[in-house]
Design a protein with these regions (language model features):
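Active-site nucleotide/adenylate-binding loops and adjacent lid/helix of ATP-dependent enzymes
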Residues: 1-99
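Protein kinase-like catalytic core scaffold
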Residues: 40, 111-113, 208-210
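Short, solvent-exposed loop/turn segments at secondary-structure junctions
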Residues: 46-49, 83-84, 108, 118-120, ...
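Cytochrome P450 core scaffold surrounding the K-helix E-X-X-R motif
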Residues: 54, 124-126, 219-224
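Phosphate-binding site of ATP-dependent enzymes
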Residues: 59-62, 66-149
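C-terminal active-site "lid" helix and adjoining low-complexity regulatory extension at the edge
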Residues: 155-180, 187-192, 201-261
Length: 261
């Protein structure tokens, strides 16, 4: 995970240790100052999607940010920025281009269902598609990008619109290691069977899990980029997952089509 400096939890400040130790604002700013960083990543700790709320600020900005958000009893994490691998910067240098890797647990095994990379465009610093300024490109098993990328409006392109870099000429560094990292982490979370991981590749070529998604995840973008990604697993998924949750109705038994009392 990215290196954390301190956290805001329910409006109170805590250092990065675990168990968390409560600190005051002066101590939090001293921790930030001690990093000698010129910029910090500030992002919501929960109920965030699509890069919403993520900000980049200097120490002065951080000092102004703290009082307001402590009063609101909100939850934030303040982290070191990720410095991505030079190859990933070749795709788009203004933001960290992350790989979405989806894993599924069936029986005792965890497998990678699909992967795509989100590439920024223009001056955007957030690579999420819902921000409307990114392109998603499918990733093959060997780390090579697919031929086409798609923006949030499903417009197709074969090269980056800013600099003309052909997608299918690019291979993601350390892609195998990134997949294995997600598999290993998923193995340690036994109560979740479907997880979407956002992974960066740092300057040393090591995978860095930026975050993982267990709530508002879907496979729409994966299927646009790579086709019906659950096809190899569909029989096992349907056989195992007996209950279908229908909004407004509740759980339906796939075997009987009768909702329980």
């Amino acid at each position: 995970l990215p290196q954390t400096i301190f956290r805001i939890i329910n409006g109170r400040l805590f250092d990065k240790s675990y168990p968390y130790r409560m600190i005051d604002a002066d101590t939090a700013l001293a921790l930030a100052r001690a990093t000698e960083l010129s910029e910090f990543v500030v992002k919501p700790a929960r109920d965030s999607s699509g890069g919403s709320g993520v900000a980049f600020m200097d120490l002065a900005g951080l000092a102004s940010f703290l009082p307001a958000h402590m009063r609101r009893h909100s939850d934030w994490v303040i982290q070191h920025p990720i410095r991505q691998h030079e190859c990933m910067s070749a795709l788009h240098a203004s933001c960290v281009n992350t790989i979405r890797i989806i894993t599924i647990r069936l029986s005792a095994e965890v497998s990678v269902v699909s992967a795509f990379v989100r590439i920024g465009t223009g001056t955007t610093r957030v690579d999420n598609l819902t921000a409307g300024k990114s392109i998603a490109v499918g990733v093959e098993q060997d780390g090579r990008l697919g031929r086409y990328g798609y923006d949030n409006d499903l417009r197709r392109c074969s090269a980056h619109p800013d600099h003309g870099y052909a997608f299918d000429s690019f291979v993601i560094p350390s892609f195998s290691a990134a997949q294995q990292t997600c598999i290993d982490l998923h193995q340690s979370i036994p109560d979740l069977d479907f997880i979407s991981w956002d992974v960066a590749i740092d300057q040393q070529g090591k995978p860095v899990v930026v975050e993982f998604n267990v709530g508002r995840q879907d496979i729409n973008t994966s299927q646009v980029c790579s086709g019906p990604v659950l096809n190899p697993y569909i029989d096992e998924v349907l056989a195992r997952d007996r209950w279908l949750i229908i909004p407004g109705i509740g759980p339906i038994d796939r075997h009987t089509d009768i909702a329980p009392d």
